[in-house]
Amino acid sequence: MTDNIPLQPVRQKKRMDSRPRAGCCEWLRCCGGGEARPRTVWLGHPEKRDQRYPRNVINNQKYNFFTFLPGVLFNQFKYFFNLYFLLLACSQFVPEMRLGALYTYWVPLGFVLAVTVIREAVEEIRCYVRDKEVNSQVYSRLTARGTVKVKSSNIQVGDLIIVEKNQRVPADMIFLRTSEKNGSCFLRTDQLDGETDWKLRLPVACTQRLPTAADLLQIRSYVYAEEPNIDIHNFVGTFTREDSDPPISESLSIENTLWAGTVVASGTVVGVVLYTGRELRSVMNTSNPRSKIGLFDLEVNCLTKILFGALVVVSLVMVALQHFAGRWYLQIIRFLLLFSNIIPISLRVNLDMGKIVYSWVIRRDSKIPGTVVRSSTIPEQLGRISYLLTDKTGTLTQNEMIFKRLHLGTVAYGLDSMDEVQSHIFSIYTQQSQDPPAQKGPTLTTKVRRTMSSRVHEAVKAIALCHNVTPVYESNGVTDQAEAEKQYEDSCRVYQASSPDEVALVQWTESVGLTLVGRDQSSMQLRTPGDQILNFTILQIFPFTYESKRMGIIVRDESTGEITFYMKGADVVMAGIVQYNDWLEEECGNMAREGLRVLVVAKKSLAEEQYQDFEARYVQAKLSVHDRSLKVATVIESLEMEMELLCLTGVEDQLQADVRPTLETLRNAGIKVWMLTGDKLETATCTAKNAHLVTRNQDIHVFRLVTNRGEAHLELNAFRRKHDCALVISGDSLEVCLKYYEYEFMELACQCPAVVCCRCAPTQKAQIVRLLQERTGKLTCAVGDGGNDVSMIQESDCGVGVEGKEGKQASLAADFSITQFKHLGRLLMVHGRNSYKRSAALSQFVIHRSLCISTMQAVFSSVFYFASVPLYQGFLIIGYSTIYTMFPVFSLVLDKDVKSEVAMLYPELYKDLLKGRPLSYKTFLIWVLISIYQGSTIMYGALLLFESEFVHIVAISFTSLILTELLMVALTIQTWHWLMTVAELLSLACYIASLVFLHEFIDVYFIATLSFLWKVSVITLVSCLPLYVLKYLRRRFSPPSYSKLTS
């Protein structure tokens, strides 16, 4: 590659997700529900429907009683090799093709299918029981005859449903009334969106004002709602009451909804049902995620195809050596049946059972408590990771915010000077309460102090008011909001919010004297240091979104009548909203370099007329059904101009325990770590340094902000000249580079020891994962804890979710769930490495077992003039791959080359695993040669040493074959487990005991002779001893790296 990257022509920007996705309407049409469209729902009158709606039945089953068996069998036989074995078994019904008893071919196939059917049946029964439990839950329905009980499955669109506290919401509803005095309720949404914080919901104002719930049936009103869709965070609709003069219309948003699957956390609520059954938000979001097929499974499938090719070739060669005489096509089929053992039918079952064992071992590991395996099909992926992509907040850090800095422009207050802030707040409210008489004139010092105190007070008051935090009072573990609020007791107050940052800010204002003690949908109460209660009316709230990066609130001070618009947000958006100043950008950078999360706080005083004009336009925009979000944003932006900058806040999110040694372990294991975060560049860089993601002796190249192709070209050329340096790039620059220089950028970035992407959107995180997979062909692992990490986790080859403060959404979407980032090291170094090596050994032994007996069959047929006559029949051929050898071979899933402590202490062992794969074409060829050697040795030895009868050949060869397999397993095991010993002895005992019942195939009197024993011993020794000698020499002169640590 040249030092200079040529200027590239414009490339079309790729879609963020190339996989086709069906929209909501297409989904509904496929389900038979017709085209989804908006609806009008009359309160309490389900018969007044303008279209048919699905029943409110939850059904997560894949099959029903009649389709279960056909469906399971179809899913199994759509795979070529399962269908191949079915055809072979069916061929035994044709007399010319029969080689022995029917059960010889049907029993192995039946066993494999039985395991699958039983597994599917258990899962289906579990789904049926869960669905029946949900569908049978009883609720109260308001009717003209009073309150009646109704099952969840019988609820219809238009019903008025009463949901009690701690009860699950049965359908998607509009919130009409609540029993809470504050006119709102809290919902627990962790089962819907994975977030553990409670969500505040507000009833329709018109219906909340009615005297009783029964009056809902006396008014003529309806809800106009948008068509069903999958968006759980937004809703557009209107409520209209026709029998009032004039008719009342209210806009409805997400704050007025009660989605099915959420749980009422406070009070009793009444709602009108909007969506049921398959149109529920929760059901429409329950889609099957991308099915991840492990790279190991793909490699095994490839080897199986090679074996199939060998099967066909050997069969054709056998017939060709007969010169295609007679009905040669029947002979080909007979040879395909004879050598069908070349393809091990039990391989998939063994590997699946092995994965179950790996998952069980991971869950039982006491050193990584709380780890959950949600996808048991890809544990081997953990042992082959080359790129780890991690979120920052809540993943590397604790997501426990600590207030560290208040900056007013001319003065900054840190932790050591918070007493000054407290004294300023105290002085303000002390002066107000004393209300001193007029003096001759304040001194200059007093004026300066009052000026500073008022600035501090305005900043603290803004922080105490501008948020979505609600104080919840608990007494003796039982929520008793009304009683506790009367006294505003500090001991039983808990803050509920969707963001840990907001809770940290409100807790800080409490520590300096201004405490949030009460809040409902229309008011807020603050308590001053003198225990005075300040009352504020909430006029409007503009919630935080990832797109806007800010939130705002308009409040009216009840004591003065002043209306104030407060806003806080990220510096990148607030810089264009606040009045011109010369310190915002510089101080934001300084605080970010200290690792602080910075928020900019501003305010704007509004005249009564100004607010009334805004409210009229805002209400009109909210009543719009089409493009509501755009119209509302336009109205809000009209206020967001020339706001007064009050302060900057800095909160610190400390690193989790043992993050530094974990990242060092991953780096030494040859895994490159990329940090993808939404934080600003300086904060992300500081965290990367503190976490030692970037080592002290590494340079950091901060990719300059680029906005077009030419700037990207120049910056990439500058970056190309750097060597062994970490890259830090913003999401905006990343988007430009990927648009014009995707290949060049990824090639350079992959050479970096570490990469930090800041201001990264969720879709960009997923795009980076996809590009790494496409450009490098290496396996990726994505780690995150929040909803914005889900797309990245699902896109990666192996997704790991961290259960954190932001909820369980990432954890539920991941393949593996951990409680702390430090557990990732053991998950990869120990369990990933062991799973990969064990599956490799298991698959090779299963293939070796099949090739050995197939080689013996080939030798036998060749000696007897290429006759298509089976060497072993009946129970011998079935028992060989089951009770005689299955347990020892499967016990390899318990083997390990080094202790767990050693694997953690020397992560270089993981790197060696990536370089020299335990399952490759080279190792496969070695095991093929071993199988051919041992099969030939056993068969020729038996033919040379047998005395007179054919049954002697069978007895000598089969016994030698069983002993060879058991010895090969014993020679391969590196760390003995007591179960391995039991498996070896049990298999040998089963064989010896079964000889009594195998007199049809084996001469029982012959095997008791000394002649039989020495012949079997010699053959077994010749087949195994050379391999043991080679293994010893290799270990002596070219030992593997792990052997140096175990010797």
From Swiss-Prot:
Cytoplasmic membrane side: 2-69, 120-303, 355-841, 894-923, 973-978, 1031-1047
InterPro entries referenced in this protein's UniProt entry, alphabetically: ATPase_P-typ_cyto_dom_N (IPR023299), ATPase_P-typ_P_site (IPR018303), ATPase_P-typ_TM_dom_sf (IPR023298), ATPase_P-typ_transduc_dom_A_sf (IPR008250), HAD-like_sf (IPR036412), HAD_sf (IPR023214), P-type_ATPase_IV (IPR006539), P-type_ATPase_N (IPR032631)
GO cellular component term, pick one: trans-Golgi network membrane
Cofactor(s), by name: Mg(2+)
Annotated compartments: Early endosome membrane; Recycling endosome membrane; Late endosome membrane; Golgi apparatus, trans-Golgi network membrane
PROSITE patterns: ATPASE_E1_E2
UniProt catalytic activity: ATP + H2O + phospholipidSide 1 = ADP + phosphate + phospholipidSide 2
UniProt keyword list: Acetylation, ATP-binding, Cell membrane, Disease variant, Endosome, Golgi apparatus, Intellectual disability, Lipid transport, Magnesium, Membrane, Metal-binding, Nucleotide-binding, Translocase, Transmembrane, Transmembrane helix, Transport
Regions crossing the membrane: 70-91, 97-119, 304-325, 333-354, 842-862, 875-893, 924-942, 950-972, 979-999, 1007-1030
GO terms under biological process: endocytosis; negative regulation of exosomal secretion; neuron projection morphogenesis; phospholipid translocation; regulation of endocytic recycling; regulation of retrograde transport, endosome to Golgi; retrograde vesicle-mediated transport, Golgi to endoplasmic reticulum
Residue ranges that the UniProt entry lists as topological domain Extracellular: 92-96, 326-332, 863-874, 943-949, 1000-1006
Annotated ATP binding sites: 391-393, 502, 544, 549, 568, 597, 677-679, 759, 765, 788-789
Residues reported to bind Mg(2+): 391, 393, 785, 789
Membrane topology: Multi-pass membrane protein
UniProt-annotated catalytic positions: 391
Entry's Gene Ontology molecular function annotations: ATP binding; ATP hydrolysis activity; ATPase-coupled intramembrane lipid transporter activity; magnesium ion binding; protease binding
Annotated CDD domains: P-type_ATPase_APLT_Neo1-like
Subunit structure: Heterotrimer with MON2 and DOP1B; this complex regulates SNX3-retromer mediated endosomal sorting of WLS. Interacts with RAB5A and RAB11A.
Similarity-based family: Belongs to the cation transport ATPase (P-type) (TC 3.A.3) family. Type IV subfamily.
Disease the record associates with this protein: Neurodevelopmental disorder with poor growth and behavioral abnormalities: An autosomal recessive disorder characterized by global developmental delay, impaired intellectual development, absent speech, and behavioral abnormalities, including hyperactivity and attention deficit disorder. Affected individuals show failure to thrive with poor overall growth, and some have microcephaly. Additional features may include non-specific facial dysmorphism, hypotonia, and feeding difficulties.
Reported function: Plays a role in regulating membrane trafficking of cargo proteins, namely endosome to plasma membrane recycling, probably acting through RAB5 and RAB11 activation. Also involved in endosome to trans-Golgi network retrograde transport. In complex with MON2 and DOP1B, regulates SNX3 retromer-mediated endosomal sorting of WLS, a transporter of Wnt morphogens in developing tissues. Participates in the formation of endosomal carriers that direct WLS trafficking back to Golgi, away from lysosomal degradation.
Protein name in the entry: Probable phospholipid-transporting ATPase IIA
Species in which this protein is naturally found: Homo sapiens (Human)
Gene: ATP9A
